[in-house]
């Protein structure tokens, strides 16, 4: 009798879980990774912190919104006949928390900083901050205003403005490329598949796009999207990073190769 009683209890609990929408247990099932939104900031490489300290804080204030950002200039070595180019970096979801420079303590900023310094490229890097409760799409006009201000103040070459984004920032990147296909010479977007975009606009900007192998439910779905982009005329470099999960792919996406892809446009 006790055996039947416990079987009855187990069946009741199981039905209760199904009624609440809980997924059944599957051995080996990989729980979904939270790609966007707020999440605790992880411990970062000390070198990333040192790089972040070399950036200068600034802000663009309007009656609607105050856009805070960090910026850094890089001096040209050799040929100084060209105007400086501009890199705009959109941070991930965790960057919306906090008030310090934690959100630029990232592999993207560090790798870009090291490359521009070693190569002696005349450039500026700017990293705006998206505040909690907003998305890059909702504050995009303020990002554009920031870019216009920097172009005027630092004599930026408007034909060489590059967009970079990680995770939540890459989702913002797809939105900005959809809104302003005329603005960016090229873009690198890491660890956020295109979901909401305007195809005929996005394909006008060359894109270097990466995803971690273990950050995809079905790789073939992503490849199908890339084929659609290319059929519509896109110049897109798509790389699956072997064996990497979401967080690993966010950090390892940025390389000399990806930066050189941007700079050749």
Q: What function would you assign to each model-found segment?
A:
Residues 4-13:
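Sec-dependent N-terminal signal peptides
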Residues 148, 152-153, 159-204:
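Primarily recognizes the serine-hydrolase "nucleophile elbow" in alpha/beta-hydrolase
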């Amino acid at each position: 009798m006790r055996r039947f009683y416990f079987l009855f209890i187990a069946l009741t609990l199981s039905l209760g879980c199904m009624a609440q929408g809980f997924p059944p247990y599957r051995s080996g099932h990989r729980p979904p990774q939270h790609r966007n939104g707020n999440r605790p900031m992880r411990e970062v490489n000390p070198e990333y912190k040192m790089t972040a300290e070399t950036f200068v804080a600034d802000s663009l204030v309007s009656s609607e919104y105050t856009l805070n950002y960090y910026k850094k200039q890089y001096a040209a070595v050799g040929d100084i006949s060209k105007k400086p180019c501009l890199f705009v970096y959109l941070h991930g979801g965790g960057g919306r928390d906090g008030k310090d420079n934690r959100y630029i303590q990232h592999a993207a900023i560090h790798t870009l900083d090291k490359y521009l310094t070693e190569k002696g490229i005349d450039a500026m890097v700017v990293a705006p901050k998206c505040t909690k409760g907003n998305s890059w799409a909702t504050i995009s006009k303020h990002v554009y205003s920031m870019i216009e201000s920097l172009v005027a103040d630092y004599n930026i070459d408007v034909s060489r403005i590059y967009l970079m984004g990680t995770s939540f920032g890459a989702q913002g990147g797809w939105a900005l490329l959809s809104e302003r296909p005329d603005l960016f010479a090229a873009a690198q977007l890491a660890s956020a598949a295109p979901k909401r975009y305007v195809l005929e606009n996005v394909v006008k900007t060359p894109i270097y796009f990466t995803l971690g192998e273990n950050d995809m439910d079905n790789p073939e779905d992503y490849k199908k999207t890339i084929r659609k982009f290319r059929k519509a005329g896109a110049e897109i470099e798509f790389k699956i990073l072997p064996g990497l999960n979401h967080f690993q792919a966010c950090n390892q996406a940025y390389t000399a190769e990806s930066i050189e892809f941007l700079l050749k446009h």
